[in-house]
Swiss-Prot record:
Pfam families assigned to the protein according to its UniProt record, in alphabetical order: Ribosomal_S11 (PF00411)
UniProt organism field: Geobacillus sp. (strain WCH70)
Name of the protein described by the UniProt record: Small ribosomal subunit protein uS11
SUBUNIT field: Part of the 30S ribosomal subunit. Interacts with proteins S7 and S18. Binds to IF-3.
Gene name for this UniProt entry: rpsK
Matches recorded under InterPro entries: Ribosomal_uS11, Ribosomal_uS11_bac-type, Ribosomal_uS11_CS, Ribosomal_uS11_sf
Length: 129
């Protein structure tokens, strides 16, 4: 059997000017995904992917770094303006939005898309520290 050579797919530079920045901010981490208007992922980053471990992942600074990394990667594909969808109760919500703006992306709209149950599943029990 012939050995298959490991060929990596070259990253094609797309020219997408508008997109959507999805910020998922939980109590443990912040994930920033930048997609085109159809929902195809262009760039993503998270606090954990940048090397933050444990409780440092949940800080606003980690969210800021994740948003900057995702913004830089998306701007390489020609991204200029984004709509922001924020989901979750975490500490990094505002920090991530500010970082996207500081990185040079123009924010056209900010939406809170946190799912709210109509009395669905029972929530986890209260923490006793």
């Amino acid at each position: 059997m012939a050995r298959k050579t490991n060929t990596r797919k070259r990253r094609v530079r797309k020219n997408i000017e508008t997109g959507i920045a999805h910020i998922r901010s939980t109590f443990n981490n912040t994930i920033v995904t930048i997609t085109d208007v159809h929902g195809n992922t262009i760039a993503w980053s998270s606090a954990g992917a940048l090397g933050f471990k444990g409780s440092r992942k949940s800080t606003p600074f980690a969210a800021q770094m994740a948003a900057e990394a995702a913004a830089k990667a998306s701007m390489e594909h020609g991204m200029k303006t984004v709509e922001v969808n924020v989901k979750g109760p975490g500490a990094g919500r505002e920090a991530a939005i500010r970082a996207l703006q500081a990185a040079g992306l123009e924010i056209t709209a900010i939406k809170d898309v946190t799912p709210i149950p109509h009395n669905g599943c029972r929530p986890p029990k209260r923490r006793r520290v």
